Structures are given as structure tokens and as C-alpha cells.
């Protein structure tokens, strides 16, 4: 490793170390007492969460010291690499993002929390491009399509008969075939300390101990949490110089969640109920941005057919870190927002004949705006291509053909097609 590479590696390692104590989801989640109190009141009273509630649960790190360290790293990146160095620009942005994340966590229970969340993850009112529909529009459009599917009544959900233990065993077996059984690369285990049905770490997937699953759920988790989230983390950990690619600031969350949803679709692992879950989150965030409170969002989920406990869980995702009458935590916009952005990126890469760019989405916790730079860094030997790639991205033939058709279909008018097909459909 030459001096230039060593400089990048040392600065990169400092970013990885500095972000270690930051645990966003742990810092914003509501504890079991809040859930029990709300359900005991039959969902009629606001959860007892305010600024004082978060003050009673202080951050597990010295926020001032962490912000200062990122400030120092950002200054040292400029001092040692200059203002326009491509790797330096990525690392400086990461430092700024992490400082903003810490400020958001310091603002738990205040109006600033929701405002900073919008800066980091976006808002439901954001348009994809000038003149295009917003995320909120996308949520409503998808809901309409899903309602048409639901109205048929013949696409039934499989009953959830698999326990967490059975889901763990199935996932472990499948992922061992992908990542290597002998190496024990990925561990899958039960956990009672998570809000979602599953969550991925660096080399593990946690399954909520009291959750029930069906075979479709397990397949989606295999693709979403395993092939994408754990896969990109392992590829990031495999980077010899740009070690920062093993960690994901908010800008990479949008790209990574979008990539995971896209993988579900092209692996035929998604299904209407799964998509409904994502659209409901987007619609709920839009409701809160329009002024809805916790009880109104809770009722929205009840109207969607969820039981009281699940409706509480869904609503609390939207308000975690905030208060029951405050602005939402907008991280859950990442799924649909990221899907559209990543899909468009791959479409354009195929149109322009730049297929070599696409697999680099998996070389770590990548961010779309960095993709051209990452291609350059691979050519310079500063970034290594991904070791673990889903088969759909190892062989780009099928995906390329799909995107060629997709590029053409974008030019057709669905309204015109609907009118012309009215006599045959």
C-alpha cells in the first residue's frame, strides 16, 4: 500500500471508528412500557412520549465528542487530500451526514427531530424529478392498484404457520449455500429486542422471537436482508482501502433499501401484501406531514385490517424519535424512494451501455450519487469489485434485456393503451 492509499485508509478507518457508537434505531425506539400502556388503554389515549421521555433515556455516547471528531476528520480529509479529491469528497459528505444524524438524535422529542429527518431521508412531498409525481402520489397510486388486486379475492396470503425458530433454520440453510457454510459467514438467530420482523447486522440477521412467518416471508427475508443488506456489508468489509464502504450513512440507506426492494422484485420474491406494507408506511408518513397525530395514524392502520397490537407497531415506527403529535421519522420512505431511484439508474446504465457500473451497487454501502466516482476508484485500485453478488447481477444478460424493453415501454401512453385494449380486457 503506497502513501496515498495509506492516507485514504487511515482517514476511512477513523470514520468507521467514529460512527461506531451511533445506534439510530436503538436511540429512537419506544420501550415496551409505552406499548403496554397504549394497549391497556384500548388505543384511546396518546402514548406517553414527550421530550422528557427521551431525556430519561440518554444517548449511549457523548454526542458533543462524536460531532467534534467528525468535524476533525472532515478538516483532516481536506488538509491531507485537498478539496476536490473524489474519495475525499465522499468522506467529507459522510462526516457531515453523521454530524447531522447526531444532531437529530439530540433533538429527540422536539420539532427539530422531524425537520432533520426530512433533510436526511427526505419527505413524502418530495418529487422524484421536476414535474414528476411525489412519493405521496406513488403511495396512493400503488394503493389503488393493490385495491384492484385485493378486490379479486383469489390471491390469498399463505397462512403464517412458521415460528421464528423454523424461519431461522430455513434462512440459515439457504444463506449458507450463498455465503459458505464452512466459514459461518452469516448467523441467523432469534431476538426479542427488535421492532421489525427481522433486522440485519454486519454478519447476522435477527428474527423477532414472537413473529410468525410463511414461506413467502422467508424468501423475501433471504433476498432483502441476506443477499442485499448482509451481502453489501460483507463486500464493504472486504474493501482494503475504502473501508468506509462497510458503513451506511442516511444517503446510502435510500440506495440500499431501494436495491433490496428491487432485488425482491427481480427475484420474484415480492408479493402484494409485502408491497402494501411499504405503501402504507409512505401514506402514513404523508398523513403526519399533513398534520395527523398518532391516534389518527393508528386508526389508519386499523382500517387497513390490522389488529390493535400490529397497528400500534406500525404507527410507532412513524413516530419513533418524535412525539405523538410531532413530525414523522421519515426513514421508511427509503424503500419506495430508493426503488424508483435505483431502477431508473439501472435503466439508464443499460440505455448508455454502461453495464459495468451496475454490479458496483453491491461493493459496499453505496450511494447513487457516488457511482461514477466508485467506477473511477475501481479503475485506480482503491475499491475492489463486490465479492458477493446475487445471480441476477452476476450475469447481467436477463436484467439487460428487461431494461431494454422497459426503456421502450416508458415511451408508451398507458392511458392510450387502456382505451385501445378496452374491448379485449
Please state what every model-predicted region is.
Residues 52, 56, 61, 216, ...:
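Post-HEXXH active-site segment of zinc metalloproteases
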Residues 173-184, 230-238, 263-273, 348-351:
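Secondary-structure boundary elements
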Residues 1-134, 403, 408-425:
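N-terminal low-structure segments adjacent to metalloprotease catalytic domains
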Residues 198-204, 231-237, 309-315:
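Active-site-adjacent bridging/hinge elements
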Residues 81-213:
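Contiguous, non-catalytic segments that form substrate-binding/exosite surfaces or channel walls
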Residues 274-425:
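Conserved alpha-helical "signature site"
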Residues 246-286, 338:
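Post-HExxH zinc-binding segment in Zn-dependent metallohydrolases
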Residues 218-231:
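Short alpha-helix carrying the canonical HExxH Zn2+-binding catalytic motif
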Amino acid at each position: 500500500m503506497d502513501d496515498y492509499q495509506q492516507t485514504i485508509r487511515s482517514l476511512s478507518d477513523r470514520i468507521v471508528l467514529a460512527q461506531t457508537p451511533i445506534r439510530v434505531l436503538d436511540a429512537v425506539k419506544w420501550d415496551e412500557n409505552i406499548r403496554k400502556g397504549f394497549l391497556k388503554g384500548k388505543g384511546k389515549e396518546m402514548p406517553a412520549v414527550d421530550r422528557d421521555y427521551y431525556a430519561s433515556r440518554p444517548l449511549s455516547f457523548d454526542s458533543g465528542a462524536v460531532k467534534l471528531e467528525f468535524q476533525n476528520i472532515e478538516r483532516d480529509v481536506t488538509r491531507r487530500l485537498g478539496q476536490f479529491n473524489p474519495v475525499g469528497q465522499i468522506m467529507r459528505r459522510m462526516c457531515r451526514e453523521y454530524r447531522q444524524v447526531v444532531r437529530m438524535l439530540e433533538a429527540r422529542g422536539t420539532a427539530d427531530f422531524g425537520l432533520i429527518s426530512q433533510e436526511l431521508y427526505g419527505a413524502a412531498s418530495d418529487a422524484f424529478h421536476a414535474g414528476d409525481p411525489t412519493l405521496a402520489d406513488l403511495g396512493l397510486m400503488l394503493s389503488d392498484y393493490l385495491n384492484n388486486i385485493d378486490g379479486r379475492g383469489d390471491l390469498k396470503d399463505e397462512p403464517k404457520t412458521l415460528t421464528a425458530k423454523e424461519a431461522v433454520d430455513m434462512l440459515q440453510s439457504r444463506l449458507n449455500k450463498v455465503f459458505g457454510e464452512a466459514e459461518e459467514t452469516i448467523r441467523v438467530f432469534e431476538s426479542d429486542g427488535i421492532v421489525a420482523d427481522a433486522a440485519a447486522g454486519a454478519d447476522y440477521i435477527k428474527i423477532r422471537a414472537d413473529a410468525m412467518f410463511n414461506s413467502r416471508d422467508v424468501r423475501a427475508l433471504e433476498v432483502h436482508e441476506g443477499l442485499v443488506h448482509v451481502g453489501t456489508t460483507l463486500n464493504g468489509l472486504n474493501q482494503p482501502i475504502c473501508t468506509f464502504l462497510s458503513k451506511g450513512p442516511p444517503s446510502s440507506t435510500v440506495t440500499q433499501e431501494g436495491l433490496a426492494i428491487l432485488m425482491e422484485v427481480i427475484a420474484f420474491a415480492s408479493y402484494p401484501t409485502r408491497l402494501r406494507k411499504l405503501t402504507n408506511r409512505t401514506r402514513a408518513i404523508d398523513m403526519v406531514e399533513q398534520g395527523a397525530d398518532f391516534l389518527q395514524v393508528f386508526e389508519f392502520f386499523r382500517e387497513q385490517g390490522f389488529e390493535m397490537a400490529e397497528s400500534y407497531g406500525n404507527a410507532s415506527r412513524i413516530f419513533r424519535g418524535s412525539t405523538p403529535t410531532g413530525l414523522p421519522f421519515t426513514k421508511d420512505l427509503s424503500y419506495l424512494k430508493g426503488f424508483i431511484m435505483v431502477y431508473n439508474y439501472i435503466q439508464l446504465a443499460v440505455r448508455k451501455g454502461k453495464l459495468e457500473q451496475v454490479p458496483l451497487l453491491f461493493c459496499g454501502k453505496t450511494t447513487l450519487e457516488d457511482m461514477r466516482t466508485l467506477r473511477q476508484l475501481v479503475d485506480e485500485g482503491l475499491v475492489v469489485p463486490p465479492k458477493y453478488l446475487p445471480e441476477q447481477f452476476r450475469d447481467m444478460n436477463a436484467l439487460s434485456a428487461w431494461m431494454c424493453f422497459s426503456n421502450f415501454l416508458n415511451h408508451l401512453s398507458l392511458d392510450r393503451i387502456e382505451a385501445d385494449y378496452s374491448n379485449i380486457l
